[in-house]
Amino acid sequence: MLYPPLNQLTSKVSSKYLIATVAAKRARELYDKPETALLEHYHSVKTVGKALEEIAAGKITPIEPELNESEFETKD
């Protein structure tokens, strides 16, 4: 069984793809700087698992940029 469960992660972050991106970036940060850990205890020993646990705990949230209509091109 996966921990944390996907439904727990998607309740915190809207997109599975965004979860993967945020987890990958955070895992790299944890690998480079293990002292930046945000939880006292992790179930996983791998950095990706630790990053997912932080997302599930609400310690990590993605910052989604606001898009303006002028940022999109329309083709007629």
Swiss-Prot record:
A Pfam short name: RNA_pol_Rpb6
Reaction equations catalysed: RNA(n) + a ribonucleoside 5'-triphosphate = RNA(n+1) + diphosphate
Keywords: DNA-directed RNA polymerase, Nucleotidyltransferase, Transcription, Transferase
CC annotations in GO: DNA-directed RNA polymerase complex
EC identifiers of the protein: 2.7.7.6
One GO-annotated biological process of the protein: DNA-templated transcription
UniProt xrefs under InterPro entries: DNA-dir_RNA_pol_omega (IPR003716), Pol_omega/Rpo6/RPB6 (IPR006110), RPB6/omega-like_sf (IPR036161)
Molecular function per GO: DNA binding; DNA-directed RNA polymerase activity
Subunit field text: The RNAP catalytic core consists of 2 alpha, 1 beta, 1 beta' and 1 omega subunit. When a sigma factor is associated with the core the holoenzyme is formed, which can initiate transcription.
Role noted for this protein: Promotes RNA polymerase assembly. Latches the N- and C-terminal regions of the beta' subunit thereby facilitating its interaction with the beta and alpha subunits.
Family, per entry: Belongs to the RNA polymerase subunit omega family.
Protein name as catalogued: DNA-directed RNA polymerase subunit omega
Lineage of the species this protein comes from: Bacteria, Bacillati, Bacillota, Bacilli, Bacillales
Chain's gene name: rpoZ
